[in-house]
Amino acid sequence: MTRDFDMLSALQMVQDITAEAGLIALGMFGQVEGHEKDDGTLVTEADRRVEQYIRKRILDQYPHHMVFGEEDGSGGMEQSPFLWLLDPIDGTNNFASGVPIWGISVGLFYKGKPFLGVLHMPCLDQTFWASDGEGAYCDGTRVSVRRTDTLARNDLLLISSPNIPHWDFSAQVKYRITGSTAYSMALVAAGNAVGTVCNHWYVWDVGASMVLLKEVGALVTDIHGQSLFDLENRDYRAPGPCMVAASPECHALLMQHVKTS
């Protein structure tokens, strides 16, 4: 039962863990090479070490919870209603190339719903966090999503790739690619961008940022407008569908530029 779960204690623990994991990763930043996995994505020794550290710390505290990470898959009790999603380094290509836009993402879902999340960006010295019913924050300041009834030429739209089959690039906005799905979503939650469109993601990428977006009242949907907040019954190893995330107002505007066929 969630009433037996100490949210404040868990949030503090995850903030501490991600900060400590950030120091591990920073010690290897610019010193490790990436190797291509079977799915075509990169992995470094830093990814593995950071995930092992976070996984152990969480399971030491919550041995009856389930943990699912990008590198080592599932651990703990698979039937638990509590699911921790770990991305040890979101933005591995950036990390391996010496680009400082990468983060450590830890999200907790309860019965498939976003519950608690922390995204720590070590090089930027920036931390986002959110918990169920308590709002979303960046470095202690509460954040809010952009709400507007028009898209302006200088508004930032964060995309995962310059080639998104379901997106009409005639939309008059400024397109940017951060190289980190989690960070792009966090920037939307913080109001720095009007939205994000991502056509290639996995549950571990979005674990923390889904909580951020839920807490600021944003929508996260597929191209048909179906909510993606509920992870229950998902295949955690399968890539997610093309995602559109924004405030309800901006989401409606962005959906006008989505191609569903």
List the predicted regions and their residue ranges.
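Generic detector of well-ordered alpha-helical packing
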Residues: 48, 71, 88-91, 122, ...
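DPxDG-like acidic metal-binding loop motif
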Residues: 78-139
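Residue-level signal for inorganic ion chemistry
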Residues: 25, 47, 58, 92, ...
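Short loop/edge segments at beta-strand edges and connector loops
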Residues: 69-71, 140, 179
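N-terminal subdomain of lithium-sensitive/metallo-dependent phosphomonoesterases centered on the IMPase/IPPase/PAP
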Residues: 1-89, 256-259
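An extended, acidic
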Residues: 145-261
